[in-house]
Amino acid sequence: MAVEMFYDDDADLSIIQGRKVAVIGYGSQGHAHSLSLRDSGVQVKVGLKEGSKSREKVTEQGLEVDTPAEVAKWADVIMLLAPDTAQAEIFTNDIEPNLEDGNALFFGHGLNIHFGLIKPPANVTVGMVAPKGPGHLVRRQFVDGKGVPCLIAIDQDPKGEGQALALSYAAAIGGARAGVIKTTFKEETETDLFGEQAVLCGGTEELVKTGFEVMVEAGYAPEMAYFEVLHELKLIVDLMYEGGIARMNYSVSDTAEFGGYLSGPRVIDADTKERMRAILKDIQDGTFVKRLVANVEGGNKELEDLRKKNAEHPIEVTGKKLRDLMSWVDRPITETA
């Protein structure tokens, strides 16, 4: 089924320019949204709790900052870009008491609305504007006169103005220059979670670790295994990112291409596909989100235990040692400290 697409000519920038926008959160997306909205002639304030380390950065970049409650009271459009696991508390404590008839509550991801963790009053427009790229790219493309494609969705539309407002917002951060895709909260949330869990984060991570283990257990040096299953992954992903699977296969050697065709289906087979379907079902029926909420309510104990176990995998020890040899690789603070 073809998606519905919109561009700058379909958007009325004056709609969002006539509103007061509160952006709650100043992480990757928060800073990109806030600065680009301001540069598009929109009134913007940033909401951050007292004592937040980001407050100084906000003022240095010429934006006004106040508490989430105060900016929510001031604004008529509120974009909630805090982490998923913090949003419900922020909504309950800071946003909901300050919502007025006709306000709009926007999100950059649909999880809390789709799974009912946040339930806005019926007289509020609920929408989503979600750039399909990290915040630094969203901002850089905007400054360069370009844009990153965006998704928009509307969950509640009491006044029938939700889509026009979301499209105007997307245009103000550069999204309509590239293209805006209309979706639903359900589709965005479930596809995003599935991609993260089955392929991008969970699936890729386990594939890499298992490949490393097989090689080391067969007697190969851990350093050789690291190079072959992790380090070179970037080369392959970059080719796929630029031109799809066909570009990758065109660019690698005939030996690599032929071997991939033969052995790939032996690794990812029909049983794997069934397990992927089970993962998707857990997402769709709320099983995953219930576990996510339980983890947060338990003080993130399960997440911390999983992080600790992951950090102890031999591939991490080997990788840290090898990355010391790579002057061209940006090192995370945790490795350079």
UniProtKB/Swiss-Prot annotation:
Its EC number is 1.1.1.86. The lineage of its organism: Bacteria, Bacillati, Actinomycetota, Actinomycetes, Mycobacteriales. Belongs to the ketol-acid reductoisomerase family. Residues 3-183 form the KARI N-terminal Rossmann domain. It comes from the Bacteria. This is Ketol-acid reductoisomerase (NADP(+)). It comes from Mycobacterium sp. (strain KMS). Pathway: Amino-acid biosynthesis; L-isoleucine biosynthesis; L-isoleucine from 2-oxobutanoate: step 2/4; Amino-acid biosynthesis; L-valine biosynthesis; L-valine from pyruvate: step 2/4. Mg(2+) 1 binds at residues 192, 196. One of its GO terms (molecular function) is NADP binding.
